[in-house]
Curated annotation (Swiss-Prot):
Keyword Hydrolase (UniProt): yes
Name of the protein described by the UniProt record: Hydroxyacylglutathione hydrolase
Xref: Pfam families: HAGH_C, Lactamase_B
Family, as annotated: Belongs to the metallo-beta-lactamase superfamily. Glyoxalase II family.
Molecular function via GO: hydroxyacylglutathione hydrolase activity; metal ion binding
NCBIfam families: GSH_gloB, PRK10241.1
Cofactor info, note text: Binds 2 Zn(2+) ions per subunit.
Subunit composition and interactions: Monomer.
Name of the encoding gene: gloB
Keyword field: Hydrolase, Metal-binding, Zinc
Length: 251
């Protein structure tokens, strides 16, 4: 299997998973033009589309793509029914695409109906987890997002996190504002800074590393607890997550 990223809009990535025969899966096509260009260049044959949630920058290209490839099956949560979805899926469902079975699990927080798709090692997580960060809470609660991130963090160490935005540098600047002396965060910030200076993608990332570099996955870490306690005393990791998310919103 070959993993490809297609830049879209200002900072989106549309992920495409293709096999050696050229059949492919497209994830969260927010616009059609860059996908159609890549299909022509690579001679891909689209088989399916995965949608993680209903926001326009993830679904805006679906209907145009279906005009070109009407046979394609579009998987998505109920909140995407009017966006071109032809097969509504929910937590606990699975999808057989390109000969691989993808498990589907609910990750509410960014939106209430947000879902993720996982077939080892690939995780298509939309706007739930970013490298160094997590999605804004547009519809769900901090508690819901915390539980969603716990689900992702429990996946195998070598899981490839294929998230939908190039937010890594900004996320790591925020992380440094919270844990300025953390060796993992400083090292990763330097690496990300170098990549972005060359306009190179920072994704996908390996979950094992993300657990070290992403403060939103470290709410039980003693160093982070000590830093948060300098400003406020919070007993539960879920409360610490909510505090971090609120700080990031105004960073």
């Amino acid at each position: 299997m070959n993993l490809n990223s297609i830049p879209a809009f200002q900072d989106n990535y549309i992920w495409v998973l293709s096999n050696n025969e050229g059949r492919c899966l497209i994830v969260d096509p927010g616009e059609a033009a860059p996908v159609l260009n890549a299909i022509k260049e690579k001679n891909w044959q689209p088989e399916a589309i995965f949608l993680t949630h209903h926001h326009h920058d993830h679904v805006g290209g679906v209907k145009e793509l279906l005009q070109h490839f009407p046979h394609v099956v579009v998987y998505g949560p109920a909140e995407t029914q009017d966006k071109g979805t032809t097969r509504v899926v929910k937590d606990g469902d699975s999808a057989l695409v390109l000969g691989h079975e993808f498990s589907i699990f609910a990750t509410p927080g960014h939106t209430l109906g947000h879902i993720c798709y996982f077939s080892h090692p690939y995780l298509f997580c939309g706007d739930t987890l970013f490298s160094g960060g997590c999605g804004r809470l547009f519809e769900g609660t901090a508690s819901q997002m915390y539980q969603s991130l716990k689900k992702i963090s429990a996946l195998p160490d070598d899981t490839l996190i294929c998230c939908a935005h190039e937010y890594t540098l900004a996320n790591m600047k925020f992380a440094l504002s919270i844990l300025p002396h953390d060796s993992f965060i400083n090292e990763y910030y330097r690496k990300v800074n170098e990549l972005r200076a060359k306009n190179q993608i920072t994704l996908p990332v390996i979950l094992k590393n993300e657990r070290k570099n992403n403060i939103f996955l470290r709410t039980e870490d003693p160093d982070l607890i000590n830093e948060i306690n300098k400003e406020t005393k919070l007993q539960q990791p879920e409360e610490r997550f909510a505090w971090l998310r609120s700080k990031k919103d105004s960073f």
